[in-house]
Amino acid sequence: MIVSLQNVSKRIKGKIILENISLELERGKIYGIYGVNGSGKTMLLRAIAGLMDVDSGAIFVNGEKRVYGKAPGINIGVVIEKVDFYGNLAGWENLRLLGEVRGPFDDSEAKRLIDYFDMDHYIDNEVNTYSLGMNQKLAIVQALMEKQPLILLDEPTNALDEDSVERLYALLSELKRAGRTVVVVSHKKEDLRQLCDMRFKMSEGRLYGEEE
C-alpha cells in the first residue's frame, strides 16, 4: 500500500469535514473520488498531502505516518484548487523554481510533458498572460514532472479543452502502467468511469463504498 487512512476525522467550527474515513490505496492504480461540491473531496486530498491537519485517526504514505506541515518521505504530485504561480515569470521559470526547491531538477520529463500538452508556443511567456486552460496544464505538468509515485489531482480537467482532456487521461493510464498511483477527484461521476480502477463516493464528509 502506498496510502493508508485509518479512521480519519476532521471538523471545522463544528461542521463535519471528514468522518471516520478508512482507505487503502495500492501502487499502480487510478482511484476516483466523486461527489457534489462541499462533500469533502478536496479536504481528503489536502489531508493525504499533509496540507491539512486532522482531529483523529492516522494517515500513512509509503509506510510513514503523515504529519501536518512535515515534508513526506516521498515526493507527491499535487494539483489542489488553484496553483499559485509567479505571474511575472514565464511558465518555464516557474517549473524550474519549483523543481529546484524540491531537489535537483532534471528538466527532461518537464520538457516531455510540455511537448505532450502542446505548450511549447507559450511556455516562455509570463504566466499572467495565460488563459485558465493554459494555467491548468502548467499545474498538471508541475505535479507530474518529477515522476512522483503518488499523484493527487483535484478536478484536473477544469478549463481544459476536449483534446487536452483526452491527452491527460491517456497520460494517467500510462503512469498507472509505470506503477504510479493516481487519485482523481471530480464532481462528475461519469468522468471517472472509463479512467479509474476503483471509484468512491463522498457525501457530507463520509466515504461510501467502492466500485471496480
Label the predicted regions.
Residues 34-36:
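The feature captures the beta-strand-to-loop junction immediately N-terminal to the Walker
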Residues 49:
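Helix-to-loop junction immediately C-terminal to a conserved catalytic motif
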Residues 57-72:
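Conserved ABC transporter NBD signature motif
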Residues 96, 107-122:
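Conserved ABC ATPase "signature" region
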Residues 151-155:
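Catalytic Walker B motif of ABC-type/P-loop ATPase nucleotide-binding domains
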